[in-house]
Amino acid sequence: MSDLREQALEYLSRLGSNPATAFKEDRVIETVKEILSEIGLEHKVDEFGNIIAKISGTNPTANPLAIVAHMDHPGFEITSNHDGNYIAQAMGGIPPSSFESGVPVQVILPDGKRILGSTMGMFGEENERQVLIKLDQPQDLEPPLSAVFDLTDFELDGEHIRMRAVDDLAGCGSILSALTRLSSGDAPPGDVYGVFTRAEEVGLVGARLMAEAGTLPPETLVISAESSRSLPGAEMGEGIVIRVGDAGFTFTADAESVLIRARETLQQRESGFKCQRQLMSGGTCEASAFAVFGYQTTGIAFPLGNYHNGAPEGRIEAEYINVNDYLGGIELITEAARRVSDRVNTAFRQRIREVPPNLRQRMLDTGN
């Protein structure tokens, strides 16, 4: 576990050092590509900028498995200059207090340099979701540019990982860690895809376009790896969550069986392995985008605090997850990739399938 922990946290720290909003994920994209090259995995980039890495399986009849996460996070896009300050459009769901005056932000230049500033309150009509941004040190900028909350890139705080963008860099980091483990051990039965999408926060755009295009084989089982607001039954510190649905869909039992079989295997191997199961209806994840286009889908979720940087009492703060939930999620999806061909043999399926002879006989005796 110590090697897994060190590598997983290093990947996540590297990803977190690259702030990104929808349509401006360039530096996260480069970091993902860099790590994939270090792992020794080839990848392709589709016409929409989504990244697809692949590990080939040993059994051509086994279902492929895809694990999907997005690279963007809610923030602002600076669109124009206004009397020496800058108009910025909200990109994705941000807390209501983001539209107040005095919220510290970082403006991200094309070379990655960050310029500090703060909001000056709402600009225009409320439904336009715009703010005015004032730079700490006035200078001429060339829009469009991303602006993000001035929060920590990455911090390990006891049992918590705190980041501006846990959602969904934790998903991306977990996929990269799982691919690292799978590439250095025995090959999985089916092909395994690591998928890194764009513009999720403004409507699952990258995932929808990729699913529509049929980039993944139609028989692929798709797992969405998300960081989602903790709630009863999906509580921080109680383990990775098998997500059985979201606000839009109940996901498919066949795809979920891969995760259930992986959970059973891990709990037999490690008596303390924690895993929860819950329908998380607080929002919609990328599994729904693939479900609409006919894929069998399921999901995992890291229970998240300060969802979209919204802290109690309206404060803007870093998101956070439990470090052991994160590491457990990596173990779960790694094991799931190895259990694709074994998913019909979950304990529950076997118990339901195999009617005890005495009960069968009693039904026969009393059936007429």
Model regions and ranges:
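N-terminal hydrophobic/helix-forming segments and targeting peptides
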Residues: M1-N368
